């Protein structure tokens, strides 16, 4: 497998949660411990870099030491947006890195198997993201009223880690910065560049913590897996 830098985006404001979801306890350990341990155990991950709030930098180093994380290379202060945080982390990656994986720190149940599978697809296609087929009906709306019903079979929800060829990713980030463009996720960055992104098979358990109900579900799922 190609050498992969695993970036954990953990500098968000957690405004919807009302508290720092990254360090919420799931069965006795911080939520972000899950991604750290999965990346540590993945054969394709060479180094881990965390983009964090300035007030959390030392806490991440302490957590890594407690968990026995040896791949952690840097903890950087994130920016105002996800893209700024990813760019700050990207600057710390080794020159020999061949793939860049960007993962939401608020997805605590990511597995080694998912990381390896998406990395393998990115190695083949240049860009890959884990995805799940949409299951709910999708409506386009305007001013609170339905405009049309979308063809659900053509839509997918995407997860992280999103993995990209390192050279392509660095180039895309540079172009976006020069153009003053800021994207909500890295897949959208590659869409802007016109590069196809492969949809890898996602994991229904790889949920994102956005509200209290997500924490309860994640805790239940993690109990089953231990």
Feature locations, PLM:
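N-terminal glycine-rich phosphate-binding loop and ensuing alpha1 helix
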Residues: 1-58
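Conserved alpha/beta core of the MobA/IspD/sugar-nucleotide pyrophosphorylase nucleotidyltransferase superfamily
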Residues: 2, 156-226
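Residue-level signal for inorganic ion chemistry
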Residues: 8, 32, 89, 103-104, ...
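Hydrophobic packing residues within well-ordered alpha-helices of enzyme cores
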Residues: 17, 60-61, 118, 169, ...
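Short aromatic/basic micro-patch
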Residues: 25, 109, 149, 163, ...
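Conserved N-terminal catalytic core of the sugar/cofactor nucleotidyltransferase
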Residues: 33-97, 177-179
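Residues at the starts of beta-strands that form the adenosine-phosphate
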Residues: 46-48, 127, 196
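Conserved beta-loop-beta/alpha segment of the NTase-like Rossmann-fold superfamily
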Residues: 74, 81-145, 159
């Amino acid at each position: 497998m190609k050498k992969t830098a695993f970036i954990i985006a953990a500098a968000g404001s957690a405004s919807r949660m009302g508290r720092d979801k990254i360090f919420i306890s799931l069965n006795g350990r911080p939520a972000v411990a899950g991604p750290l341990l999965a990346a540590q155990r993945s054969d394709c991950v060479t180094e881990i870099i965390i983009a964090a709030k300035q007030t959390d930098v030392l806490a991440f180093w302490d957590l890594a030491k407690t968990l026995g994380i040896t791949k952690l290379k840097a903890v950087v202060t994130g920016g105002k947006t996800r893209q700024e945080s990813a760019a700050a982390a990207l600057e710390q990656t080794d020159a020999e890195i061949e793939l860049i994986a960007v993962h939401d720190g608020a997805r605590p149940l990511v597995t080694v198997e998912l990381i390896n599978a998406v990395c393998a697809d990115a190695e083949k296609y240049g860009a890959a993201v884990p995805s799940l087929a949409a299951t709910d009906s999708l409506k386009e709306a305007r001013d609170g009223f339905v405009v049309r019903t979308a063809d659900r079979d053509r839509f997918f929800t995407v997860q992280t880690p999103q993995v990209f060829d390192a050279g392509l990713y660095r180039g895309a980030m540079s172009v976006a910065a020069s153009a003053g463009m800021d994207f909500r996720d890295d897949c959208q960055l590659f869409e802007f560049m016109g590069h196809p992104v492969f949809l890898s098979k996602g994991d229904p358990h790889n949920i994102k913590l956005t509200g209290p109900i997500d924490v309860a579900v994640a805790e239940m799922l993690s109990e089953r897996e231990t």
